[in-house]
């Protein structure tokens, strides 16, 4: 079975890294104690007043993480260039806090410049969307959901990354909510008004949630994120390390409007083409939490990706919405790049669309959205 994004590490390496981290315990390096922890009572749902805000909600900051040689090997230099480029672009619009292992923090500061705050926190990898907390807003301000990151079902070393959510919440002094399921932030997309989109392949999966049914997981999602409607697409198991995250397929630009990553005309068929077709059918017939049908906007993938590898993520839908900006990938297909930028300008009026070359991330099977996690303003 081919696993993209990063090839699974050898078991010996995983064991060695995990063992070393286990000896470290949960020391917080002197960070202040968090405000506390919030339980998620069964059936609490939106009645408790907590909700997942949409990504366009104003941000306090963006969190990112610095890639490590342990995971990326000889490719780490190019990947770090991409991360620095994204961090600098986002920092033009809002504060960026980039987590880095202490010994690598000076190099991260040099690469990113003074406009990016580098925070020494142990990390394994760069995918902050998945390892970081997912923030929710409610009557008591803000809380962070810890989804118990487990390396996408144990596919990669994650001893440090499994503690990243707690470390961020401790540092921000934000209440932690321990989820009753295992998932990643990239597996959940919300419109900010009670509707979620998820892929079944990455959630109803024994490598994250053994013994839990789709109904069990849906109840947990509704309780955690204040949702009343969950739209499920099938996705694809075992074809990429995430088991197919929704944020590489479909995004809400606003309530009732879904941006759908669409294969280029005449693109060869594969497992992901079938997943797209199934998702499109679901979305065209779905209704949101308001009981309204969705408007599906196609965001065509590039037709020409040159000599890039088979696992390359050529997906414009993996963009990031910052304060006053949309940060999107650029792939070198001038027509597709231009069309995608124009579509996003129409969908996000008043925001600057910034397009960046991030081919090293793409070769790893991820993108800009995968590498970022927003901290929303509590208002």
Question: Where in this protein do the model-derived segments appear?
Answer:
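N-terminal secretory signal peptides and thylakoid transit peptides that target proteins
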Residues: 1-16
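C-terminal motif of bacterial Sec signal peptides marking the signal peptidase cleavage site
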Residues: 22-23
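Short, conserved catalytic or interaction motifs in soluble domains
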Residues: 26
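The feature marks the mature, well-folded catalytic cores of soluble enzymes
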Residues: 33-379
């Amino acid at each position: 079975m081919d696993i993209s994004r990063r090839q699974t590490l050898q078991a010996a390496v995983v064991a060695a890294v995990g063992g070393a981290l286990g000896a470290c315990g949960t020391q917080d390096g002197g960070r202040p104690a968090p405000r506390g922890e919030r339980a998620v009572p069964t059936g609490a749902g939106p009645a408790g007043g907590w909700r997942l805000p949409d990504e366009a909600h104003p941000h306090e900051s963006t969190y990112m993480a610095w890639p490590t040689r342990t995971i990326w090997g000889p490719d780490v230099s190019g990947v770090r260039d991409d991360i620095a480029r994204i961090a600098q672009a986002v920092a033009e619009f809002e504060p960026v806090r980039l987590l880095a292992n202490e010994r690598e923090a000076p190099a991260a500061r040099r690469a990113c410049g003074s406009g990016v705050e580098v925070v020494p926190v142990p990390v394994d990898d760069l995918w902050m969307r998945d390892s970081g907390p997912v923030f929710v807003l409610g009557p008591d301000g803000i809380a962070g959901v810890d989804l118990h990151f487990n390396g996408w079902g144990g596919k990669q070393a994650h001893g440090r990354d499994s503690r990243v959510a707690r470390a961020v919440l401790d540092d921000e002094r934000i209440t932690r909510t321990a989820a009753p399921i295992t998932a990643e932030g990239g597996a959940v997309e919300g419109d900010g008004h009670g509707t979620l989109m998820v892929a079944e392949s990455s959630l109803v999966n024994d490598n994250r949630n053994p013994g839990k049914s789709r109904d069990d997981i849906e109840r947990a999602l509704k309780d955690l994120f204040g949702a009343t409607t969950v739209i499920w697409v099938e996705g694809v198991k075992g074809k990429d390390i995430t088991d197919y995250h929704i944020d590489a397929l479909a995004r809400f630009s606003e309530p009732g409007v879904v941006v759908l990553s669409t294969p280029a005309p005449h693109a060869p068929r594969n497992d992901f083409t079938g997943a797209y077709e199934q998702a499109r059918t679901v979305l065209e017939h779905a209704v949101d939490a308001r009981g309204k049908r969705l408007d599906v906007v196609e965001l065509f993938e590039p037709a020409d990706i040159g000599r890039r590898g088979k696992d390359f993520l050529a997906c414009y839908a993996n963009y990031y919405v910052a304060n006053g900006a949309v940060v999107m990938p650029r792939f070198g297909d001038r027509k597709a790049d231009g069309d995608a930028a124009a579509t996003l300008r129409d969908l996000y009026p008043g925001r600057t669309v910034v397009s960046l070359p991030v081919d090293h991330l793409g070769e790893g099977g991820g993108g800009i959205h995968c590498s970022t996690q927003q901290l929303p303003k509590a208002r």
